Amino acid sequence: MALLQISEPGLSAAPHQRRLAAGIDLGTTNSLVATVRSGQAETLPDHQGRYLLPSVVNYHASGLTVGYDARLNAAQDPANTISSVKRMMGRSLADIQNRYPHLPYQLQASENGLPMIQTAGGLLNPIRVSADILKALAARATEALAGELDGVVITVPAYFDDAQRQGTKDAARLAGLHVLRLLNEPTAAAIAYGLDSGQEGVIAVYDLGGGTFDISILRLSRGVFEVLATGGDSALGGDDFDHLLADYLREQAGFSDRSDNRLQRELLDAAIAAKIALSDAEAAHVEVGGWQGDITRSQFNDLIAPLVKRTLMACRRALKDAGVEAQEVLEVVMVGGSTRVPLVRERVGEFFGRTPLTSIDPDKVVAIGAAIQADILVGNKPDSELLLLDVIPLSLGLETMGGLVEKVIPRNTTIPVARAQEFTTFKDGQTAMSIHVMQGERELVQDCRSLARFALRGIPALPAGGAHIRVTFQVDADGLLSVTAMEKSTGVEASIQVKPSYGLTDGEIATMIKDSMSYAEQDIQARMLAEQKVEAARVLESLTSALAADAALLSAAERQAIDAAAEQVRAAAAGDDADAIKEAIKNIDTQTQEFAARRMDQSVRIALKGQSVDEV
């Protein structure tokens, strides 16, 4: 079901037309773009066959360069070469200066306190820089696909807050892209491995990139990925491996001059090449600055072991925060180029007690997952493969007294959406309310689909109808329904989350809609009967309470007439004639009008007892 393409299940506005979509991994160090072609997700290379695009932009008076060309200018033009801009996204100038005090850029605050970077191309904010990276990726995709993109899915870290996510969306819009969805990076990686349709349980995503380390603990339940905990180290990554190895090579070669920037660059390049070689070989030969020698994998492992241990400490903290044990983790997904290092894979496997998933290139796995999601959201996947909600296909509501369904969000409402309704207690002194979340178009609970149940407790003990409970239904962009019930006077609340689309095929949805039409008249009659029965029960409940408190206000004849009317209501409510119940309720209302007036007068006299006219 395509985003914003509202149609009946099983129908498509243009079934022959394939829309162009891409998944974008907008990374701190490198970015990638991927798409689905011929049913396979693939990352798209540049003209030199390089899949990674360094997340670097160099601004100069005549324009800008992005990627590898921009990175070459970092040494000689640091003030105008912006890298790792993702770290600045959604942050204030003060926050950035506190976190990253050694940035080579000239920063200043805008009127609203947001950071602006002074460059040869003018004052720029992080959103604009990110937009320029996105433009370069989009250009690569449009050239490869020979057409403009209909939409993109962009990945973001699971810990990104609303401001950071909004900044990412704004950058995409500035780049001229239609954002289908922002997708959490660990979720994208899990989707790439097909874990979204596999065994339910806990999944760990270990993401060791060039400059940062992130660990995410997810729980997959009924088609929903829930982020249980995140952690990591924003100052630890594969770059640290490179610098340790470069320092080791400097020591082995006897180079003492640390002011030689050119030599430092050569050492770093040699270290990177050796690290890559040691992923496949037990030893690597190094030549740098006139020195040559060998380094073994064992030596390299000794250098980086403390850093790998730090990542595992972060994993341990994340598991503790999530409230799960390492042995409960079903799968471990490896993300980031630095997870190619054999020691990393070995130690992670030992820590979690299982072999990590590494069959997909760890540099590409997030982009591939985003591409798969984009292909679905843009409308290229048949509904039978995966149903994602962009309009609500079936109404969502609650069970009310009498087995009725009160619709809160009607079908074909576009998402995200939030709706609320108020309900009251049915009985005197009621202190709890059962919330039964329903899905479907029929009028009765028995004909709709049960999604979830939960209870709201701690309601003040008041007369029937005295407590007011506000029930809010909220469906996010991923089709995840959150239902929250709150008692208004106390603020006590309870909530639950559920994926309405989980386990439903398109055919089942169509059948449910068809049935609602076929049985419409019958359902309305059944609803009217049920409503009258509920009203009858309410009237009798109220009458019982009133008689228990104030029967002395009635004469024997009046009491007999009321009892007879009540019995008439009970008899009618036991039958299936809604009109008969309605007439019986009307009759008892007539019989009790004088009783109600006397009770009101008595209450007023009690309330005013001992007060003078002036006081009143």
Swiss-Prot record:
Transmembrane segments: none annotated. GO terms for molecular function: ATP binding; ATP hydrolysis activity; ATP-dependent protein folding chaperone; unfolded protein binding. Keywords: ATP-binding, Chaperone, Nucleotide-binding. InterPro entries: ATPase_NBD, Heat_shock_70_CS, HscA_NBD, HSP70_C_sf, HSP70_peptide-bd_sf, Hsp_70_fam, ISC_FeS_clus_asmbl_HscA. SUPFAM superfamilies: Actin-like ATPase domain, Heat shock protein 70kD (HSP70), C-terminal subdomain, Heat shock protein 70kD (HSP70), peptide-binding domain. It comes from the Bacteria. GO terms for biological process: iron-sulfur cluster assembly. Coiled coil: none annotated. CDD domains: ASKHA_NBD_HSP70_HscA. HAMAP family: HscA. Belongs to the heat shock protein 70 family. Chaperone involved in the maturation of iron-sulfur cluster-containing proteins. Has a low intrinsic ATPase activity which is markedly stimulated by HscB. Involved in the maturation of IscU. This is Chaperone protein HscA.
